[in-house]
């Protein structure tokens, strides 16, 4: 699998009300300080696996977790325990090709989740499978509550409601397609 992990600084402009606004396109930006905003480039899912051990050992009626895997056990981008993000959506171009950041999208279409680390990778449980069906959904208990404030047309400041523990995190789209061709997670690390 391929992990896109380039972090590039973006330029910012100041709006009339003193808020920083990226002068670049749609996406998610980490606000490092009042003077520095960094574009977050997603990591792409390298594989997907299902742990069917319990199903085989005990019963086919037991659900098995479906996980997506990111290469490397740590994100390139590091931040503090109460990170602030800027979400920029396309409000002008009527961009319907980009379901993530199109004109009908809002921060409520995204979830913040903690990723499980292994020696070589990071994982996210995206659902369960049973003998009868697959159920793809990120459970409520996995989602970290976010607050958001609109600061301009299609521009929102987003942050966790409570400080985060050290570890690996990701921002995911609620209707993501979890495959190795297009599945992506906007990942970051909190220092220990």
What does each of the following model-derived ranges do?
Residues 124-153:
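Extended, solvent-exposed segments with strong compositional bias
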Residues 154, 163-168, 172:
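A glycine-anchored, Pro-Gly-centered beta-turn/N-cap motif
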Residues 3-130, 174-192:
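Primarily secretory-pathway and cell-envelope proteins
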Residues 1-4, 169:
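Periplasmic N-terminal soluble interaction domains immediately after the signal peptide in Gram-negative
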Residues 159-161:
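A structural micro-motif recognizing beta-strand termini
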């Amino acid at each position: 699998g391929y992990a896109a992990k380039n972090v590039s600084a973006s330029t910012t402009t100041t709006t009339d009300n003193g808020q920083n606004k990226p002068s670049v396109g749609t996406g998610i930006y980490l606000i490092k300080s009042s003077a520095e905003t960094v574009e977050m480039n997603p990591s792409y899912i390298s594989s997907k696996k299902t742990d069917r051990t319990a199903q085989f050992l005990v019963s086919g009626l037991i659900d098995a977790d479906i996980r997506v895997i990111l290469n490397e056990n740590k994100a390139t981008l590091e931040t503090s325990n109460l990170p602030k993000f800027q979400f920029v959506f396309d409000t002008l171009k009527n961009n319907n090709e980009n379901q993530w950041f199109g004109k009908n999208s809002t921060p409520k279409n995204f979830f913040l989740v903690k990723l499980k680390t292994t020696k070589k990778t990071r994982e996210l449980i995206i659902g369960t499978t049973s003998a009868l069906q697959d159920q793809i959904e990120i459970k409520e208990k996995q989602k970290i509550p976010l607050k958001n404030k609109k600061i301009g047309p299609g521009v929102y400041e987003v942050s966790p409601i409570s400080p985060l523990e050290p570890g690996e995190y990701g921002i995911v789209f609620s209707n993501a397609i979890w495959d190795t061709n297009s599945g992506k997670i906007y990942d970051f690390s909190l220092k220990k």
